[in-house]
């Protein structure tokens, strides 16, 4: 594929809405975008004289992307709204290199009341409940279960879905037994109304619980009083720390973005009855080669939070600033929920103040991350080793084996300021030498870049040889990943450890570095390397134990350790040995040994 092919492809673009995709020489997807007019939009990325090249009017990052592009594909749609939905779906599924992906697939819980029931009660859901008389509260980004427990602790409402006679909750004064008509429906609904008011005003719930705790303590029921005290502490921790009430008892949502030092901060306020009942913030590292696209982020953020399978509580969304596809998003959401949804940018008044507050909190969240010690170290690493990316997302690799037995590899992940153990990976390896083992691990990880986006930095436990190996793999993948390697300093061909700390060398594509053992950058990289080493050793030991157990079974059959090792070397694992053809086993270790294996 060449630029000449690309120029021919540009001539086929229609004057209709749709989605376009850019690909590089290796066929890797670089970018997905949507357009009202595909021909006009896509051609705006290019200049055509004296030959095809990136339009210099675009940002440097966009120009870099276009220089990599050798092929484009497009899909036409009936409308720009359809194109936007398809674009968002492609970004989530395909993880293009130059698109920003907000990695948050969580669905948050709502507390709801079903008024179709004779005696309604509080329940929790993460999806839309298909009933007509439902009152929702939320979403709650943390502590929904704790809030529900606290409500039932103070307000004696029905808790069980079905009950024909007074249950245990009635016996402990936590229910008034409406199932047995021991409370009128009118009185029950009054209590429910008080509970719903307290749910929207946690300070009321806290005061009520404090009164209950005092009564329990006065009655020397200290165990129950302690439980109530713990509930109070939990609810205080859940309270949104932003004290701002809107004069009108309105329901609406607020979104704001902030971007600084390669960090994107998103913030969402949920306002019900004029009060901020929950807030959700998220920090996402943005790689240096990805275009900061405010419009793209607002689209993802709002579409993800207003999906069809969750309750719609607010018809109005306020955003901190204007973005390109705001009106188009209004159209999509209105069609999705079959009612008018407005997305507004308030200019003055209390709505403007709450949007400003959301933006200020988004900025504060970045500042909190920056005050973290490791963030400072990451900035120093970028400057000192001349890295292209700020290393917010780091993958660290190590291998472990014992004389060619139980060969394993390990990858650990450090994201922003903590270990992301959900991304740790283990590898069973075929090869027996360090170089081929590392090549196997890194290649397998690179092949997954389309499913799990690449990090900012790879840290390899090894020297320059393994650094060069990693570089080849990254270049062939087309990803933008910085690489460092860490190895023990060698004296007389032996690893040297000085008193007070390990003497390690850092290898980068710029050269080799010997840092002081007290250098914070070295200590940070050693911390990363040591965690990968710990994880690899632990996996190796567990694998070795399993192999030893299986080996002992063969030894009990009378096979020598030499024969067992010969079988493992040939078949790779015990499962393959047991499944092997009798004839093949006979040729390898003799008829007698083969019979023992197949008979057992």
UniProtKB/Swiss-Prot annotation:
Family annotation (InterPro entries): GIY-YIG_endonuc, GIY-YIG_endonuc_sf, GIY-YIG_UvrC_Cho, RuvA_2-like, UVR_dom, UVR_dom_sf, UvrABC_protein_C, UvrC
Keywords: Cytoplasm, DNA damage, DNA excision, DNA repair, Excision nuclease, SOS response
Gene3D superfamilies noted in UniProt: GIY-YIG endonuclease, UVR domain, UvrC, RNAse H endonuclease domain
GO MF, one example: excinuclease ABC activity
CDD domains, per the entry: GIY-YIG_UvrC_Cho
GO cellular component: cytoplasm; excinuclease repair complex
Domain of life from the UniProt record: Bacteria
Localization (cell): Cytoplasm
Subunit and partners: Interacts with UvrB in an incision complex.
Protein name: UvrABC system protein C
